[in-house]
């Protein structure tokens, strides 16, 4: 019997379109003899849709047309089953959902919000837990956790938007303790959205003003001179995990921007056979693998994640830039370099999810009995004690 895997993507996020690219790629790589893929698209108003045509990226050229031929749906619990249900007066059942694979990026789908909803329903889902997903979305919390656990990160300062608006001078003075050039980043966005490299205070102020409409928390980091950028993926859970090959990012600008990632498509230049070439010493590459696993475990990640590194080759140092708990395309290109097909990657993620769910189900979820059955008795005893004290007076 095939498992029905609900693939949820889209969402109210600035990375909406990136999510569609990832999801349509992955949905067409499942073993259809073992799994039935159920596409669940969430539009920018957070309305859920189902339709077989949602598996093809070609249809998304006209979103209005996509939604016209799709059904509005909800994911609900009926007894011990999870049902994808058509919205409307009659609420027709579309199918049972055995497992969910979230493939959204950014707010709501990657930051623990969707994971929290699925967790509350009790639906098994691929990937990191609510807490790990939330940490993975917040660059500030990540860095503070990494620092505490002796994982190297670049020097940084962070602040809330209202702090800059109320006392700009204090915030700038604090930032100016760092060494220029600096990166200004919204704390909770991915895909290099809203990131600027600045060389002086004038550029810094402008970059902060550009970042504030995107996030309530801003992080400013020191840059690495003559930087090399590299990615590595980790798959598994906190008990057991393994690393992919390492990819050096080829960039034509000062940093790996949104335009290079998705518009010009430079990330597609590295074919699997070109990945894992010796970009630094063997010792530094081994350090990267160890730090990647440590970062994965520190936040409590599960499934597959991608860890991005900054390399100072001259001084023989590596820094963890960030961890992504739902990497684009599930970082499958990094695993293909290790002779693992996209279908095999999906199969491994489903096995990890089943294992995680079994462990979760084995833990105590609630206490037997009902304390409220004794409420009147307990209340009566308290009242009696109060009366006894009053009588003693």
Residue spans for each PLM region:
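ATP-binding N-terminal substructure of ATP-dependent carboxylate-amine bond-forming enzymes
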Residues: 1-131, 135-137, 141, 160-168, ...
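Active-site nucleotide/adenylate-binding loops and adjacent lid/helix of ATP-dependent enzymes
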Residues: 2-8, 13-24, 90-94, 133-226
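ATP-dependent carboxylate activation and anion-phosphoryl transfer catalytic cores
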Residues: 3, 9, 279-393
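Residue-level detector of anion-binding/catalytic polar loops
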Residues: 36, 124, 152, 217, ...
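A short glycine-rich, hydrophobically flanked beta-strand micro-motif that places a catalytic Asp/Glu
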Residues: 38, 218-222, 230, 302-314
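Short acidic-glycine loop/turn motifs at beta-strand connectors
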Residues: 43-46, 236-239, 312-315
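Phosphate-binding site of ATP-dependent enzymes
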Residues: 196-275, 279, 283, 317-318
């Amino acid at each position: 019997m095939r498992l029905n895997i609900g693939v949820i993507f889209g969402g109210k996020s600035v990375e909406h379109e990136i999510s569609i690219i990832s999801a349509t790629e992955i949905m067409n790589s499942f073993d259809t003899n073992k799994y039935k893929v159920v596409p669940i698209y969430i539009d920018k108003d957070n309305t859920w849709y189902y339709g077989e045509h949602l598996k093809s990226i070609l249809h998304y050229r006209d979103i209005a047309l996509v939604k016209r031929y799709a059904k509005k749906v909800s994911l609900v619990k009926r007894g011990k089953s999870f049902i994808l249900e058509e919205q409307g007066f009659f609420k027709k059942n579309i199918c049972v959902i055995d497992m969910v694979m979230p493939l959204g990026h950014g707010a709501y789908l990657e930051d623990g919000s969707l994971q929290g909803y699925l967790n509350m329903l009790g639906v098994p889902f691929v990937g990191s837990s609510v807490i790990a997903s939330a940490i993975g979305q917040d660059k500030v919390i990540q860095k503070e956790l990494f620092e505490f656990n002796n994982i190297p990160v670049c020097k940084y300062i962070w602040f809330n938007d209202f702090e800059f608006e109320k006392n700009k001078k204090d915030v700038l003075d604090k930032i100016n303790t760092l060494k220029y050039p600096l990166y200004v980043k919204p704390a909770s966005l991915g895909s290099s959205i809203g990131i600027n490299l600045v060389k002086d205070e004038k550029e810094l102020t402008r970059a902060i003003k550009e970042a504030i409409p995107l996030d309530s928390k801003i992080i400013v980091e020191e840059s690495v001179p003559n930087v090399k950028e590299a990615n590595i993926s980790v798959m598994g859970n906190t008990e057991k995990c393994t690393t992919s090959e390492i990819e050096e990012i080829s960039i034509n600008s000062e940093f790996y921007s949104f335009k290079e990632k998705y518009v010009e498509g430079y990330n597609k230049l590295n074919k699997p056979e070109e990945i894992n070439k010796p970009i630094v010493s063997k010792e530094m590459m081994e350090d990267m693998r160890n730090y990647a696993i440590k970062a994965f475990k520190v936040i409590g990640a599960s499934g597959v994640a991608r860890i991005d590194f900054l390399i100072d080759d001259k001084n023989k140092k590596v820094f963890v830039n960030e961890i992504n708990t739902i990497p684009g395309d599930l970082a499958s290109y990094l695993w293909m370099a290790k002779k693992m097909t996209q279908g095999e990657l999906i199969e491994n993620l489903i096995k990890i999810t089943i294992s995680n769910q079994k462990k979760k189900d084995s833990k105590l979820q609630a206490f037997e009995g009902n304390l409220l059955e004794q409420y009147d008795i307990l209340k009566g005893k308290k009242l009696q004690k109060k009366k006894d004290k009053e009588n003693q007076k």
